[in-house]
């Protein structure tokens, strides 16, 4: 099967990246990208997951596979979706439905993981898709939409957070914890004491901006994630 898949949502073409596991009918893990777009970072994660026996699909939240090249460009692509969580949910649900209909993917056996902005995308899919099996956020934004649908969250939820992340304050943590509890989710929040934002990205090295790679947090969070996949599937 080809790596790049074009799927349409609301008249816009989106370009996802599919990494195929050795087995034919297998579960699939969606990967939601950072604010930079569907770049090589998430494609490499997709290939890693395929080696572990899971099909993986790096979704495109911006359309046409757009990738930003600066902080300003990344922000300009991400912000409209943060401002319109209904549109954000529509796009990630569209990706879920596309993948769920692929012959190679075991029906209704899908989880999602995401980084930074993609962490929020992952959690929003859990908030809006009752069939989702798991949702994992790596140093992601935790705040829910202003319009709370109040529906129970069926997916197993794992949030992996750096204590020194300046982009996610205690207010987000408290709000997330209350929401997950109110929605009867099976949820976990792990805090890495010495980690900042983007702790899984080896290229992150900007303490003033709050983004710094942390090898131990990277390795430990990946193990927690893959252990959850084994439990789910």
Predicted features along the sequence, with ranges:
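N-terminal cap/leader regions of alpha/beta-hydrolase-fold enzymes
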Residues: 1-233
């Amino acid at each position: 099967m080809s790596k790049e898949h074009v799927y349409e949502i609301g008249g816009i073409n989106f370009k996802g990246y599919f990494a195929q596991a050795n087995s034919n009918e297998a579960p699939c893990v969606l990967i939601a990208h950072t604010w930079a777009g569907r770049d090589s970072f998430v494609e490499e994660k997709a290939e890693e997951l395929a080696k572990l026996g899971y099909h993986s699909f790096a979704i495109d939240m911006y359309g046409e596979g757009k990738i930003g090249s600066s902080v300003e460009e990344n922000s300009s692509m991400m912000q409209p979706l943060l401002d319109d969580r209904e549109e954000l949910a529509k796009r990630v649900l569209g990706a879920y439905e596309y993948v769920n209909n692929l012959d190679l993917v075991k029906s209704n056996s899908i989880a999602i993981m995401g980084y930074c902005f993609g962490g929020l995308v992952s959690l929003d899919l859990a908030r809006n898709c009752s069939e989702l099996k798991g949702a994992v956020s790596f140093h992601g934004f935790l705040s829910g939409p202003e319009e709370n649908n109040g529906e129970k969250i069926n997916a197993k939820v794992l949030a992996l957070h750096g204590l020194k992340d300046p982009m996610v304050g205690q207010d987000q943590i408290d709000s997330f914890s209350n929401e997950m509890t109110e929605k009867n989710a099976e949820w976990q929040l792990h805090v890495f004491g010495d980690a900042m934002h983007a702790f899984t990205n080896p290229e992150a090295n900007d303490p003033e901006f709050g983004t710094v790679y942390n090898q131990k947090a990277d390795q430990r969070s990946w193990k927690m994630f893959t252990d959850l996949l084994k439990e789910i599937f």
